[in-house]
A protein has these predicted regions:
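Conserved AAA+ ATPase "SRH/arginine-finger" region at the nucleotide-binding site
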Residues: 73-75, 149-162
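Helix-loop-helix "sensor" segment of P-loop NTPases
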Residues: 158, 162-182
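Conserved C-terminal helix/linker of AAA+ ATPases
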Residues: 199, 203-223
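C-terminal helical "lid" of AAA+/P-loop NTPase domains
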Residues: 182-187, 193-207
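Pre-Walker A (pre-P-loop) alpha-helix and adjacent loop at the N terminus of AAA/AAA+ ATPase modules
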Residues: 1-43, 87-94
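Short glycine-rich substrate-engagement loop in P-loop NTPases that contacts/grips substrate
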Residues: 20-23, 66-100
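Conserved catalytic/switch belt of AAA+ P-loop NTPases
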Residues: 90-91, 104-146
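Walker A/P-loop
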Residues: 30-71
Length: 223
């Protein structure tokens, strides 16, 4: 199994939210307390796609719904009718769902005409919600934005990464103190994908030559 897949967040509690308000809206939507359309926007690797799919799974955790039918990339929608949206919602409601739910990845890749059609569909059909992701909020039709709650995702700081990074290191047999882990991550800036690369490198350094890793750790952490 790929390292990134092995340590992919399994629940929303494993997602690192920079903004407490965003965390609240996300978790309340996943718990079926909110039913407004969402646009998760921000830079690549900020956790938007993981969050969108975990919201969807949270809404249907107790139901027998094929999650694979609930997520689509915008580029795939360019080659077919947006009827897939209401079709998926109806499929989900056939299993007893009050509201259908579909994740649309990179929704900004829809041409303007398709975005306007999408807006008309969500206006007409109130029995489902869409959860969209984008790296480019400015490319999304403003009236479509107005029908959604737009939540901004940004990169966590090293301090915010600390608990998750330490847990991953622990799982792989590298037991460091919080101070050591923080110093090990010193200087890191970047996305969740870059963090996974960083941690994988650290773990491979440890497993390939523990003595050299210990020396590296002493240099990097000052221990």
């Amino acid at each position: 199994m790929k390292f990134e897949e092995k340590h992919r967040p399994k629940t929303l509690d494993e997602i690192i939210f920079v903004d407490a308000y965003v965390e609240r809206i996300v978790k309340e939507t996943a718990a079926n307390k909110r039913h407004k359309h969402l646009i998760l926007h921000g830079p690549r690797g900020a956790g938007k796609s993981e969050t969108a799919n975990l919201i969807m799974k949270g809404r249907y955790a107790e139901e027998d719904v094929n999650i694979a039918k609930c997520s689509v990339h915008a580029s795939a929608l360019e080659d077919q009718s947006l009827d897939i949206l209401t079709g998926n919602w109806n499929y989900q409601r056939a299993f007893g769902m009050l509201h259908g739910c579909l994740v649309i990845e990179e929704v900004d890749q829809l041409k303007l005409g398709m975005q306007q059609t999408l807006r008309a569909i969500v206006d007409e059909h109130t029995f489902g919600i869409i959860i969209c992701t984008t790296n480019n909020l400015h490319r999304i039709d403003q009236p479509l934005q107005d029908r959604c709650r737009c939540l901004e995702f940004t990169y966590p700081t090293v301090d915010q990464w600390l608990p998750r990074a330490k847990a991953i290191l622990d799982t792989n047999g590298i037991f460091l103190t919080e101070v050591q882990t923080q110093l090990l991550l010193k200087g890191f800036e970047g996305s969740g994908r870059k963090m996974m690369d960083w941690l994988e490198d650290t773990i491979l350094d440890f497993t390939s030559n523990k003595s050299e890793f210990d020396q590296l750790l002493e240099v990097r952490t000052g221990t």
